[in-house]
Amino acid sequence: MAEDSTPVSATGEPSLRAPVTAADVLEWLEQAAEAARSGELDAPALIDLLGQLRQASTACANASDWALLAAREAGASLRQIAPVFGKGYVRAPAARLEKLHREVLSSEQFLELMRRRMGNR
């Protein structure tokens, strides 16, 4: 019997997961590469995919910024956050927070900013 690997919160409830994972992207990339090799995807289709991926990348970066703000608001220290930035020191998340705080002061303000930007498209 396979174990359920769904993350749980401190209360024991299932934890919210990111909408896409690195494994999901790799699986998709393998399929896309095979389609490109076999000629199923021509240059215009690949350019369209490139545009979609760049938009998705921006959306993921925005979600990451929101999560950073929300984690700090929930009491996480920069030392706790630093490892997810791939660094053992706090400069990376601190610099990102400093940049974000030039535009917004909270995760809720950030979410509202994203809503406004999406409405302007």
Where are the language model's segments positioned?
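General nucleic-acid-binding
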Residues: 1-44
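Short, Lys/Arg-rich amphipathic alpha-helical interaction segments
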Residues: 83-84, 88-121
